[in-house]
Amino acid sequence: MAKKSAIEKNNRRKALAARYAAKRAQLKAAAMDENLSLEERFKARLKLAELPRNSAPNRVRNRCEITGRPRAFYRKLKMSRIALREYGSRGQVPGLVKSSW
């Protein structure tokens, strides 16, 4: 089980990223727009840099929904390899069958 503080910090980052997503996208579009003057594009870049650091989506870490483990994460199932093995052996993951040959 991951530290509760690490899980909560990641949840705060998710919320912050969602809150600033529209503003960030708007500023990015303005900064990349070649029809705007160089000065306006530069101002958009500066405003983008002023946004909270934790509002960037790449600061959010994929974590297991069950244990909070940050590594060995399966995106499709939103769980770590350890939780997947545990739940799979109990037959709680639909479509997952133990392999034998």
UniProtKB/Swiss-Prot annotation:
This is Small ribosomal subunit protein uS14. The keyword Zinc does not apply. Keywords: Ribonucleoprotein, Ribosomal protein, RNA-binding, rRNA-binding. The keyword Protein transport does not apply. Part of the 30S ribosomal subunit. Contacts proteins S3 and S10. InterPro entries: Ribosomal_uS14, Ribosomal_uS14_bac/plastid, Ribosomal_uS14_CS. Belongs to the universal ribosomal protein uS14 family. Signal peptide: none annotated. SUPFAM superfamilies: Glucocorticoid receptor-like (DNA-binding domain). GO terms for molecular function: rRNA binding; structural constituent of ribosome. One of its GO terms (biological process) is translation. Pfam families: Ribosomal_S14 (PF00253). HAMAP family: Ribosomal_uS14_1 (MF_00537). Binds 16S rRNA, required for the assembly of 30S particles and may also be responsible for determining the conformation of the 16S rRNA at the A site. GO terms for cellular component: cytoplasm; small ribosomal subunit.
